[in-house]
Amino acid sequence: EYSPTVVIHGIGQSKTYLYENDEIAVDEDGKQITGWPIYANTKYIIKNLLWPLVKMLVTQRDDGFVESFRKTLEGTLYVNAFDSNGKNVYDVRVKKYPQSVAKCSDEDKEEIYCNVPIDGFSKVAGEDHLYYFAYNSFGNNSEITDELYNFIGQIKRETGHDKINVVAISLGGTIANSLFDRYPELYPSLDRVVYIVPALDGSNIVGDIYLGRLSTSDEMLYKNLLPNLVG
């Protein structure tokens, strides 16, 4: 018999929603406002960026576009705003799957298998021994780690197993490493740990951003970046 497996997904492989008055918030068109997938109000974006973009392309210089873009981006991504302690500014909640995949609805199963193609594995190990840990990819690492630790405890109680498999994908590798560092007492409970294209050692790109090594010159923007983006 196989040990139960918990899958820790990668970035953006879960849904998050903005809540107001304990209900999912909607915009003026009745569309649910999500943190991920990123909620984009097309009318708002076009209204704020179209004219500044046209002016920039015609004049080949920043004629207010960068500032307009900054404000528009801020207004578009506001749902995912965090304070200095890594806490959500707004009430953003993750869609959770607190039970085994076997007990999930057909809709939830489809979401899980669409995010991570593990249906082949589930046919071998059994959906009743497969769990999907959903978390906010932009959330507080410590809080997510604590949630995962408690989730693993729940899985062991539900299945009656003493050991568990951990499958960490992409950003999930960072979460798994945090788990093992924060809760070393979990080691005896681990059967197998599988990392799939994991983010284990940080990112060179993020390091370059912090060190100011990214070019922001007009030449880079207008002659290199934009033409490549447009194709």
Task: Annotate the PLM regions.
Residues L226-V230:
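Long, compositionally biased eukaryotic signaling regions
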